[in-house]
Amino acid sequence: MILVGQFDSPYVRRVAISLHTLGMPFERNTLSVFSDAEAMRRINPLGRVPSLILDDGEVLIDSSAILDHLDEVAGPDRALLPRSGPTRRHALRTISLATGMIDKAIAIGYEHLLRPPELIHAPWIERNRVQLFTALRALEADAPEVGWFGGGRLNQADITVVASLAYVRFRTPWIAPLPDLPKLQRLSAAAEALPTFTQCLPAIEEIGGPLEEARAGLARFQGTA
């Protein structure tokens, strides 16, 4: 399998972490949605990441669809998303809050990165910031004091929440200061220390920009800034 995309994307990263967690070997194609847009569209017509190219050449797009396939291959006993009932619904709600946070952080980042300063729309940034912070507080209220969202076993809710938190930290120059999140910070630190997570940190080249800024961005991503 070949995973297309860079680890500065939380959607690519949650797929990569899931692949490592399930013990599924894969190669990487580190195309950028910006600098490699044409090549990206040849793989995914939308030019978005992640894509997963299966061994037979079939291309899966969208992280949720990819993760669904990985769970199917892994089987019900190893799947990262609970099979049914309240535990599944709770995991899906947690994942939805986390991916919603990602989308809000992306919207704020694009406002700063892609618009001329005179066209940045402060009310739109504030709306997204409020939505992001509300989701953060909801996740903090629901986060466990010990262990994982999935109880004694890390599951997809944990992976997606931790990937989303890393991305939000990465974007903190535009979102800060973040609210106090002791339970989420504990869970994030525990997860980010696992080899399955450390193998999926973005390279300096993937963060881009001047070297010192890229290093600072990586430190925020890791939660060490």
Predicted regions and their residues:
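Short, hydrophobic secondary-structure boundary micro-motifs
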Residues: R78-R83, W148-G152, P177-L178, T198-A203
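GST-like fold's C-terminal all-alpha helical module
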Residues: A98-A189
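Charged/polar, low-hydrophobicity segments characteristic of intrinsically disordered regions
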Residues: A141, A191-G209
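Acidic/histidine-enriched, glycine/proline-rich intrinsically disordered or flexible terminal extensions
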Residues: L201-A225
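Non-transmembrane alpha-helical segments in soluble domains
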Residues: L67, D71, L92-I95, L136, ...
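GST-like domain detector, emphasizing the conserved glutathione-binding G-site
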Residues: M1-P123
